[in-house]
Regions:
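N-terminal export and membrane-targeting signals
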Residues: 1-8
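Extended, solvent-exposed, non-transmembrane regions
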Residues: 10-198
Length: 198
């Protein structure tokens, strides 16, 4: 098992609506979300640093440093995503939980990007290159940078690998973008209070 520093081990997982093309950029909400998965198996991995601009829950502008992880293709087993909306009138906090990818049919994503703030996982990378100029990763095994209005330095630090396997994944993220995202066995639930995936 190869353990790479946290920026290298960032898992590209999350829940998002299926999209036909990659969004260049968007303002992130004032809420990060948590994701867990038993396993992620991906091909064509790339990663680099960026800034996500967005808002607080009070509407003030803010920004978040993130590690953007990208996969050309990824299969995710037993995925859970949770987000908590705090301080709603009368009822207080409400938790939204989404689960998918169980019963032998993993979640499948193509051209997947996830903007991650924190990650815990065991990770194994195959044929990894660390220290690649981020803008040059478009010529590597992964999808490279998003482009568009993204706030990232194409001459900055990047890394790429032919494949990656991550197990026992726990992460906090601000955004996910995917070309396609198939959520097998999707179940959504709402509950009062704080009930997160971890």
């Amino acid at each position: 098992m190869v353990m790479v520093p946290s920026v290298a081990a960032t898992a590209a997982i999350g829940v998002a609506l299926a999209q036909g093309a990659l969004a260049a950029s968007f303002s992130v909400s004032g809420q990060s979300f948590k994701v867990t998965a038993d396993k992620l198996e991906g091909t064509g991995f790339s990663q680099y640093g960026a800034i996500d601009s967005g808002y607080t829950l009070k509407g003030e502008k803010t920004a978040h440093p993130v590690a953007v992880s990208a996969f050309s293709s990824a299969d995710i087993t037993n995925m859970c995503q949770s987000v908590v909306t705090p301080d709603l009138p009368i009822i207080g906090s409400v938790s939204l939980t989404l689960k998918a990818g169980g019963k032998g049919t993993p979640v499948h994503a193509e051209n997947l990007y996830i903007d991650v703030e924190d990650l815990q996982a065991d990770a194994t990378f195959t044929n990894i290159d660390i220290g690649v100029a981020a803008g040059d990763m478009k010529n590597g095994p992964g999808p490279g940078m998003k482009g568009g209005k993204e706030t990232a330095n194409k001459y900055g630090f990047g890394q790429q690998a032919e494949s990656a396997v991550l197990t026992d994944v726990k992460q906090t993220a601000w955004a996910t973008t995917a070309g396609t995202f198939k959520l097998s066995g999707l179940k959504m639930s709402l509950s009062k209070g704080v009930k997160e995936c971890y």
